[in-house]
Regions:
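Condensing-enzyme catalytic core mediating Claisen C-C bond formation in acyl metabolism
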Residues: 14-61, 162-223, 227, 303
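Claisen-condensing/thiolase-fold acyl-transfer catalytic domains that form or cleave C-C bonds
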Residues: 66, 70-73, 77, 97, ...
């Protein structure tokens, strides 16, 4: 009989996944702290000291999440050296979709010509990209698809209150994409947790703007992220010294520094692009991944 957990060697169950291409896109308009301080009671020094952010990219009128997502997707497909027709599924993580439906993924499909792909969006705020990656990973491991395009795309500038200085200074717009493919070696592990007690710490309603309890989110992240990192390292039998980069969601430089300290890992192993991008929500991890890739800082086999 078949016993769960008993896997035959050489079956599809052994299939793992790897990133075979990356791409990113940000709006050309840059909004720096000095310009923010012309219409908000804030200053460059105040923002930088608390967040590490100097500037952020802001979408022009009519520049949508799908437009940025499609730009990032085209670059990722080119980087992977494949044709758009080879993409079998497109998953877009976004909290700022063009429409409630059609999904942003459908709009991307249309723009890039991935006519054979299954398409859907996924909404999980800043963690969206990781959830989308875990779904793509599961699809490939199950043998359903061979190549999946995973995108994080946000135009947060359209949903923040530009009079709320505690929130609007944090966010930026952008999109990052990866093509996930099959890999017979290596191991991909996802461990996703959600804090059941803090659902209201960061909200975006249908009628109003983003509302955030920054202090609560900060203390949660500094406490919980190191635990999750340790869990993944243990499960993959990897020592923290073997890890080249820890690529975290780019929410706040102070937060990332605190996490590095708690893990007792040099902060240099935590790449950041907050200074020029701000918090791009679901786009932050894939945008950063693509930047590292373009700077030739990633080598196949890196952890």
């Amino acid at each position: 009989g078949h016993f769960p957990g008993k896997r035959k060697r050489g079956t599809e169950a052994d299939m793992n996944t790897k990133i075979i291409g990356t791409g990113s896109a940000v709006p050309s308009r840059v909004l720096d702290n000095a310009e923010l301080s012309t219409f908000l009671d804030t200053s460059d020094e105040w923002i930088r000291t608390r967040t590490g952010i100097r500037s952020r990219h802001i979408a022009q009128e009519g520049q949508t999440a799908s437009a940025l997502a499609a730009q990032a997707a085209k670059k990722a497909i080119a980087d992977a050296g494949i044709a758009a027709e080879q993409i079998e599924a497109i998953i877009v993580a976004t909290s700022t979709p063009d429409y409630i439906f059609p999904s942003t993924a459908n709009l991307v499909q249309q723009e890039i010509g991935a006519e054979h792909a299954a398409c859907f969006d996924l909404s999980a705020a800043c963690t969206g990209f990781l959830y989308a990656m875990s779904v793509a990973d599961a699809y490939i491991k199950a043998g359903m698809y061979k190549k999946v395009l995973v995108i994080g795309a946000e135009v947060m500038s359209q949903v923040v209150d530009w009079k709320d200085r505690s929130v609007c200074v944090l966010f930026g717009d952008g999109a990052g994409a990866v093509v996930l493919g099959e890999d017979s070696s290596g191991k991909s592990i996802f461990r996703l947790h959600s804090d059941s007690g803090s659902a209201q710490a960061l909200t975006l309603g249908k009628e109003n703007a983003v509302h955030m309890n920054g202090r609560e989110i900060f203390s949660f992240a500094v406490r919980k992220v190191p635990e999750s990192v340790k869990e993944v390292l243990e499960e993959s039998e990897t020592a923290k010294e073997q890890v080249k980069y820890f690529i975290l969601h780019q929410a706040n430089a102070r937060m990332i520094e605190s996490i590095a300290k708690r893990l007792d890992v040099p902060v240099e192993k935590f790449p950041m692009n907050l200074e020029t991008h701000g918090n791009t929500s679901a786009a932050s991890i894939p945008v950063l991944l693509d930047e590292l890739n373009r700077q030739n800082r990633l080598i196949p086999g890196d952890v």
